[in-house]
Amino acid sequence: NNIPLLQPVKLNDTEFVEKIQSLNPDIIVVVAFRKLPKSVWSIPKHGTFNVHASLLPQYRGAAPMNHAIINGETKTGITTFLLDDNIDTGSIIMQKEVEILHTDTLEDLHDKMMVVGADLAVETIDRLTAGDFTAINQETIIGSDTELQPAPKISKEFCEIDWNNNTVDIYNKIRGLSPIPAAFTNIKTANGNVLSIKIFKTSNEIAKEAKGNHSEKLSNNKKNMGNTNKD
């Protein structure tokens, strides 16, 4: 389709900025990308908006879907918002909720959010070009008692299971990191070797137990793996 592909090392590079300016874009759409400098996001006449995988202002950051599942949320959503100088703090254009089932993994949620996000992006473009929207400043919906949940980048250390945690927390962590980057644990073999094992899912029975009772144990799993958890 003869669409130009630009991959600058530095987003504020003069040549890159001038190239974007020469394209004279009406709108710039950002999805899962690093922070754009003002020299870029201020170019389009209808603005630059981001498609973010949470109901902002909750879960600002690089891994909103992971952290929503890990924290046991039952809903999340997609937010489109106008870019500003900070990360995920711009004025909200549109939002749409997405249910998180108790058995949803990151992959399951991603597939649902992908469809909703695409539709919301198209609707947002239509509203921006028509001027049919009222941007909502995020600060106006953050109350004095609002506890904002962050969504920082997932580190390798974060992925290791802490068996001192309760069943629900362990279960949510496994599904919130599945399939990538995946939760893991280390076990020692009979000959003294230490193996690192990735865990992609737990049984449906554990899911049912964890949903109703935080004190239930991962009895079968912990025996097989040589681990015990807090419960």
Where are these regions (language model features)?
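One-carbon transfer enzymes
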Residues: N1-P181, N193
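An anion-binding loop in the catalytic cleft
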Residues: F158, D162-D231
